[in-house]
């Protein structure tokens, strides 16, 4: 099974960038009109806008369960500094547990696998940029892997 939210991620990034440009342009218009209070309010709105985007941690996610391995590639769609590309890959037999935690409209995936040194838990992966159907498909695929071990 293969799941990718590439199209949705591109749309999210495009919308974020266009909205950010509009906010900055409004701020520049207020600056040109010498409306200092409006410039400060616009700067505050922009800071809150960027802060919310960083808090949401919307990620591009590629999920694949073929060839007896689970492969998950992900990176933040909206990143101020630099993108950190991450990859998780493990054999189906190594999967010990997984949890999809939903809170405040966001979903995070946590995976635990068996290694030579014991059980290791990967950092949470934000699934907030995926649709409910895609999250459900990932959950079903991982549940099936757990059953078939």
Describe each model-derived feature in a short phrase.
Residues 2, 9-12, 42-43, 73-77, ...:
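Inter-domain helical "communication" segments and dimerization helices
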Residues 24, 42-55:
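Single-pass alpha-helical transmembrane signal-anchor segments
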Residues 1-35:
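N-terminal membrane-targeting/pre-transmembrane regions
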Residues 101-112:
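Short acidic, Gly/Pro-enriched loop/turn segments at secondary-structure junctions
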Residues 111-149:
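A membrane-cytosol interface segment of integral membrane proteins
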